[in-house]
Structures are given as structure tokens and as C-alpha cells.
Amino acid sequence: MLDRALGEPPAQIHPVAWFGRIMTLAERAGYRDTRTAGAIHAALGAALGVGAGAALRSTTAATALATAGRSLGTAALGVAEVLDRGDLAGARARLPALVGRDPAGLGAAEIARAVVESVAENTVDAVVAPAFWAACCGAPGALGYRAVNTMDSMVGHRSARYRRYGWASARLDDVAGYVPARLTAALTAAARPSRGGAIWRAVRTQAPGHPSPNAGVAEAAFAAALGLRLGGRNSYDGRAEVRAALGDGRPARAADIPRAVRLSRDVSLLLAGLLAAAAAGSAGPAAGARR
């Protein structure tokens, strides 16, 4: 909830930005085109994140630093605003803040799809997963997860440079996000109960066709909840990927971006309520025992 109220610190002082700079230096010093070198990189980054959480000690502060739901919504709505004005060039210019695909040549529908998919995936990465790991492991869990996810975004690509070096970071992120992605699908179904059956069908039958074991779950859940059809052809660094269709609805359009942001916020609120109830439940017996 602190993230919703205050947002993230400026990039110049944000600890995650500093972590990214440190890992860039580590890559320059230790890069080899091998999985072993990449595993060392991943282990170093994870250790830094966990260590930072242990030093910080405050789970609340660590969770606020690891969460980026407000900035996600702001970036997504910014694209929607320029799309509504018919400014395709402006929308393409804003897109790299949300997705890694090539924006050149994308039409309005493809830009809208990219943003909705990003909101779905980042609801896991930037909202649910940090809170989940904070609940499980405290401050080390929150910042350790954020470190893992940041490394995946930096080196977990299928490009020639990172196919081997980024393998360990990508797999570590897959493991760390596995449960949070499925929790996100459950919360999405709870937030849109009239679409619950369609959401679980999409997660069960369509998500396995996505190359990511976690992003596919979130995107399938959001597609079904919003009555959209996501997936299709994407281009990354000039390399085309054709992804399985997710959802059985219509193509996305600009007006669906605010709907996706509202859904992400509803998921966040449900998660906050769930965690508050769990905390109250665990505190209750202990308080009774003291009496």
C-alpha cells in the first residue's frame, strides 16, 4: 500500500537502480559466454538482494522498495493517453518503458495488446511476487526477489549474447515467480468472479503454450477476465516470435489499457486484504497466549 500512496523513489537514488548499476559492472568484469559464468552472476545478484534485505531489516520498507505497482499503472496509462490522441509515434516512444519488444511499425491494436500483456505480467513481477516473498521470508525475501527479477530483465534474454550467460538468471526468476503467478490468477478470478470459469480455462488450456511458465498464466488470466484475445506475433531485436493466443475475446484496443490497470489494482487490493487477514490471524493466538 505504501507503493500506491507514495510511488517509487527517483531513479537516481532508488536502490534497485543502484543494484542494476552494480550488476552491469559485474557483467563487464565476469562475462563469459557460458552458463557457469551466468550462474555466478545470478548467485552474486541474489546474494546482494538477500543481504540488502537482511541489513535493512524492515519488511515494510523492503516491500515498498520491491513493489512497483503505481509506476506500472502510470506508464501504462501514459501510453493509453497518447493512443487516444491518435499519436502512434508517441505511443511507440513510450512502449520500451513497459516491454522489450520492438515498437517500430506497431499499430494501435498491437501497442494496446503489448501494454495489456505488460500490465498482466508485471502484476506478478512488481506487485504480487514481492509481497509473497516478503510474507514468506521478510525483508530478505522481498529484496532478494526484486534482485532476481531485475537480473532476469537485464540478462535473461534469448539473444546471442545472453542465451547462455542469462540462462541461470532466467530460470531463477521462473522458480521465484511460479507460485506468485498462480496466486495472481486466483486473485484475478476473485476480482472478476463472473469470469472465473473462463479465467481458469484459459490458465489451464492456453497458458502452457506461452514460452514463459509464469507470464503466460498472468496474461491468460487477464485476457479471459477482460474478454480479450492476447498473444500473436512479437519482434525482439529483429527476431520474430509467434505466441499462442490467450483468451477467446476480441483484440485489445486503447480503452482496454485502463481496464487492465484497474484489474491490476483490484488484484493488489485483494492481496493486501489477504495478507492483512493472515497477519491478524497469526497475531491473534499469540496475543491470547500472552493473556
Regions found by a protein language model. Give the residues of each.
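Short amphipathic, positively biased membrane-proximal segments
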Residues: M1-R291
